[in-house]
Amino acid sequence: CHDRCCRFLTAASSLIYDTYRIAVECTDPEKIARYARRLAAKEFRATDVDHGTEAVRFLSTITPQGLITYTDSVKTMCDRIYLIDDEWGAASRLLLHALRSSALSAKLDIISCYCPLSPYEKLEHLMIPTIGMAFITTNRYTNVELEPYRRIHAKRFTDMTKLKIRKQRISFNRKAAREMLDEAIRLLVEAKNIHDDIERYYISSMDYAKVNTKVEETLSKIKSITEKGG
């Protein structure tokens, strides 16, 4: 189940990335850069520390329950939430990377949240708890339910006439990606059911005291390595 699930997720990621490649050709990067500079100048108050730090996290995930974005952390740490409505993935990515750079230049601590389908390159959400601000991408995949402080529409940075020429291909990508994700989720459900069935047999034989001891030993080793800088 796991290997098949990964293959379906890879296929979905490829289709979504193809839509991004189409959309980025219809997106005005200079307009996004100007908007990001204005927004940063208004909102990002520089601190007196030497430099800002960046933590990398996942806020969204694919689970047996479907696609989930964990918004409790956002609501706890940030009271001003900018929602970026973007169904194509180009404008939001460019905007978030520009805001990330500006926030770090202002020596602010940030939390960068990447897309689980493209974890090394697609910045999906950005949180800046020190100023109570978050920038959250919304689309048919993220399933975000948050009350926005402001809403930013990707259309304002997009040549919609040019984008409509590729409407058929985008529609195909969208439907096919949805089917790939649905199948991946179905396989996750199947894998969990198999795990639960197996667990019924071995759980009563588990020595949890030994498990906890091994966990503590492993954590101690990790801590020792990190303290030595190795």
State where each predicted segment sits.
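Extended, charged coiled-coil helical stalks used as long, distance-spanning scaffolds
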Residues: 175-182, 186-192, 196
